[in-house]
């Protein structure tokens, strides 16, 4: 959130909705989606850590007029980790199809072209391997 500005639309401030719900699987189920494909950017087993006191201090300073945003940021890792548990359970049950890197992901700030190319190629090749499984999932009758 610190790197993306708050945008006001008709007087209402907005930030990336991923802060509140990084992977809206519950919403997809609520509205009745039957074939759900989830594309994650983190490797299996990844869990978010709680923000440190120092980081929370920076957030409090930057967003002191947005107490709900601060609460959302403070509990983001808890919500994210519960969502990942739900996704893993649904994937295991065959109710959703999940694509995710099978290797540790690169940093959002990564600039090394070789590292980025390797990660891109990993994703491309992994999808080629999973393509048949994805089609099978999408064609499967419930």
Question: Could you tell me what each predicted segment is?
Answer:
Residues 1-142:
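Patatin-like phospholipase
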């Amino acid at each position: 959130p610190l790197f993306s500005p708050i945008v006001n639309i008709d007087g209402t401030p907005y930030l990336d909705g991923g802060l509140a719900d990084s992977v809206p699987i519950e919403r997809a189920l609520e509205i009745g989606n039957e074939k759900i494909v989830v594309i994650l950017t983190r490797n299996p087993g990844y869990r978010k850590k709680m923000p440190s006191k120092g980081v929370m201090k920076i957030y409090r300073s930057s967003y002191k007029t947005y107490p709900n945003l601060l609460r959302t940021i403070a509990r983001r890792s808890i919500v994210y980790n519960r969502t990942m548990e739900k996704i893993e359970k649904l994937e295991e049950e065959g109710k959703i199809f999940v694509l995710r890197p099978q290797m540790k992901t690169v940093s959002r700030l990564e600039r090394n072209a070789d590292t980025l190319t390797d990660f891109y190629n990993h994703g491309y090749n992994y999808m080629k391997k999973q393509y048949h499984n994805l089609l099978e999932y999408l064609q499967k009758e419930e």
